[in-house]
Amino acid sequence: MTTILENLPAGQKVGIAFSGGLDTSAALHWMRIKGAVPYAYTANLGQPDEDDYDAIPKRAIQYGAEGARLIDCRAQLVAEGIAALQCGAFHISTAGVTYFNTTPIGRAVTGTMLVAAMKEDGVNIWGDGSTYKGNDIERFYRYGLLVNPDLKIYKPWLDQQFIDELGGRAEMSEFMRQAGFEYKMSAEKAYSTDSNLLGATHEAKDLESLESGIKIVNPIMGVAFWRDDVKIDKEEVTIRFEEGRPVALNGVEYKDAVALLLEANRIGGRHGLGMSDQIENRIIEAKSRGIYEAPGLALLYIAYERLVTGIHNEDTIEQYRENGRRLGRLLYQGRWFDPQAIMLRETAQRWVARAVTGEVTVELRRGNDYSIIGTRSPNLTYQPERLSMEKVQSMFSPRDRIGQLTMRNLDITDTRDKLRIYSQVGLLAAGESSALPKLKEDESGN
């Protein structure tokens, strides 16, 4: 039995993820006058460009919602964001600059918490503003059905009647005006923006062209660090972690993780830290481009990674990074709560994050230009005296190293044998600067 409804279910309760913007406002009112019983659910995700959440449900009632609820998702959003950080669940990067999966984390929280609220109200049909070409339509589909297996999906933007009657923003604005709401269409930007407390995404329109860059974006979580007229003073900040959790900034302890992340956003934002320009693969394997902001997560990640590399051994770090990339991809695909993701999360949080206790001091300059200037932890396995070139009490002697190097003869001989085989079958060509001719000579005894 299909879970997707292509036509408006007249006479039935329909929940809509309501942002208060033109699209969802017009959709809600249209559903009401066409005979559905709409319920509006608004997620408070701490969006930096939203200043009056309490007014949003009131507007929904005015537009025809039978009921409207504001769901505070901030604590859960930050909890999932810190979990992603602890696991390094970030698979998209360009030249070492990371995208922190802030939109996928937000969708995991919104998709579960709003559908749970709808279920409490006996609403088993859900609509949202995601389009059929994007990632969110699949993310919301998965998370919604995880919470409510009886859920049906109705999206106005997949309903041909809605598209025919209200196919664009100009038509929606006129529709609302004729209904007596005097809804003024906001000025069109050169790109679209989606944000939450963790970060902001700028994409589409002019940003679809790779000839348009970060300079056309007006940051909403920080400063335009590329502009010469923007003055940015260098700043030192100390971040403290306890058992993998960020607990203090500049010596100020935070019991509330939301408050800590807000302060981290302010600090990082003053420098434009955490902005990146990424080309990525959507779930459907088509490439898209986004410009991202995440000043607070970027600041915390610098400190967390520094402590991870100072505390854990090489093989643990390798597993942390490999599993983090795998987990990041699952998160991006809307599988944050799938068993394979939970297994990877549990491993990293238990065996990597729990050992991460300490402080890191960072000097921030412009954009992603920074220096680590101090690292302190009771759990450091970095011990300079082990490798000091000075005359100190060493943990091993020159003769110990001679023995260790002698044991390497076994695998070196193995490697030479394999190189001879590869050369004989033509897999390796001996060039003038290559050592392979010498290997051939050795075969003849010279």
Curated annotation (Swiss-Prot):
UniProt keyword tRNA-binding, yes or no: no
Alphabetical keyword list: Amino-acid biosynthesis, Arginine biosynthesis, ATP-binding, Cytoplasm, Ligase, Nucleotide-binding
Protein EC: 6.3.4.5
CDD domains xrefs: ASS (cd01999)
Enzyme's top EC category: ligase
Chain sites annotated for binding ATP: 17-25, 43, 129, 131, 136, 194
Residue positions binding L-citrulline: 99, 135, 139, 192, 201, 203, 280
GO terms classed as biological process: argininosuccinate metabolic process; L-arginine biosynthetic process; urea cycle
Gene Ontology annotations for the cellular component aspect, listed alphabetically: cytoplasm
Subcellular localization, as worded in the UniProt entry: Cytoplasm
Reactions listed under catalytic activity: L-citrulline + L-aspartate + ATP = 2-(N(omega)-L-arginino)succinate + AMP + diphosphate + H(+)
List of residues binding L-aspartate: 131, 135-136
Any one GO MF annotation of this record: ATP binding
Tagged with keyword Cytoplasm: yes
SUPFAM superfamilies reported in the protein's UniProt record: Adenine nucleotide alpha hydrolases-like, Argininosuccinate synthetase, C-terminal domain
Name of a matching Pfam family: Arginosuc_syn_C
Involved pathway(s): Amino-acid biosynthesis; L-arginine biosynthesis; L-arginine from L-ornithine and carbamoyl phosphate: step 2/3
InterPro entries noted in UniProt: Arg_succ_synth_type2_subfam, Arginosuc_syn_C, Arginosuc_syn_N, Arginosuc_synth, Arginosuc_synth_CS, Arginosuc_synth_type_1_subfam, AS_cat/multimer_dom_body, AS_multimer_C_tail
Subunit record text: Homotetramer.
UniProt similarity note: Belongs to the argininosuccinate synthase family. Type 2 subfamily.
Name assigned to this protein: Argininosuccinate synthase
Organism of provenance: Burkholderia mallei (strain ATCC 23344)
Name of the gene: argG
